[in-house]
Amino acid sequence: MLSNFIKGALASIVFCASVWQVQAAEVIKLAHTANISHVHHEAAQLFAKGVAERTQGKYEVQIYPAGELGDQPALAEQITMSALDMAIVSLGNMAMYDRRLNAMTAPFLFKDYDHAHRVIDSFVMNWMNKGLAQYDAVGLSMFDYGFRQVTTQDIVVNTAEDLKGVKIRVPPSTGLMAAFDALGANTQKIAY
């Protein structure tokens, strides 16, 4: 009779232990293609820390840097297939799924940073997400890399006319390539 009591007590203790054990955090996979000293990685780390703190450890963001899970087009594709939870990719890569997003890669859209952030935060994010919804993709925010400069080896570019016939290397963004083509430049697509 005592052994039955002990068995019952042990079973109760094991049951209680399983009820009281800490639940493992739900993992969110976030990938990017930059090295670990890049601002994308720093932003990913800050995001992961914020998620852990604000959810009190319920969620853990695992970061896959430096292209561990693929290049930007592959990461964008994984997002649309629900094979990856989050990624930091260029707008040009998401434009593969909604061509209208190419409009945001055109040069000379904004007069300054304040103007850019007002437009992006109030209108562009909602507009962009409507187009990406059919792919189960949602943009949370946009990075800016600063206003772009045109850099050439030996030609000074002060006006759009100065670009006529000049070879310009651009990321594989349909919108960016079309904009420079329209300005008369000879665009060359680079790996990005």
Please report, for each region that a protein language model flagged, where it lies by residue.
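Sec/Tat signal peptide C-region and signal peptidase I cleavage site
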Residues: 18-24
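Short beta-strand-to-loop elements that line the ligand-binding cleft
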Residues: 61-70, 168-170, 185-192
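Bacterial N-terminal signal peptides that target proteins for export
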Residues: 1-10, 20
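Short, polar/charged alpha-helical segment
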Residues: 37-62, 122, 175-178
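Extracytoplasmic "Venus flytrap"
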Residues: 29-46, 66-71
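Extracytoplasmic small-molecule ligand-binding "clamshell" domains
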Residues: 46, 53-54, 60-87, 110-112
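Short, well-ordered beta-strand segments
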Residues: 29-31, 62, 87, 169
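Contiguous mixed-secondary-structure segments that line small-molecule binding/active-site clefts
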Residues: 49, 80, 85, 90-188
